[in-house]
């Protein structure tokens, strides 16, 4: 609906892309974000029910606990993203099998990052209401300032700097490039490889920190 509404008033310099085509990758990113948020909310519910305490005293490694939660949340996010990708032709986007495979791979990487971030926040939250508050002031701005709604190049200078320091901006960049460029071309694209390195590093960092936090703070 937003793509249709802004289609005649949006244009990129030197591009013939309509807003629906520009915004579509942003919706995929939003699906990954919200799936991660809602899958990690269950961590708080598990603590309230006493289930998490039982898991922590069981003879399993902290790594297994974190990996299971993060991979489960990522699987849910990936399923939602794949379903949404099936509707890409409605936005005027034609995807080849190679592009689809690349997009699914990127969704896994980004989903791991979002779920790892959600895990870290949920681990310190005592109530679902508190988690929702963090979601409003932290998670949503990450998406809004990622270039999902408007290009970084067209933003005010100060806002552009903020967006460049946002790791989700680079996740948005690799997704958008995967939608509109051939995978064979992206292998040699420095901009794509740089953004992929940042997005992948961010995902690895959130997962590593999640494991360290669980090992450090097990008194739930």
Model-derived features with residue positions:
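Membrane-interfacial helix-loop-helix junctions in multi-pass membrane proteins
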Residues: 11-14, 147-204
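Hydrophobic alpha-helical transmembrane segments
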Residues: 1-17, 218-220
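Transmembrane helix segments
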Residues: 2-7, 122-169
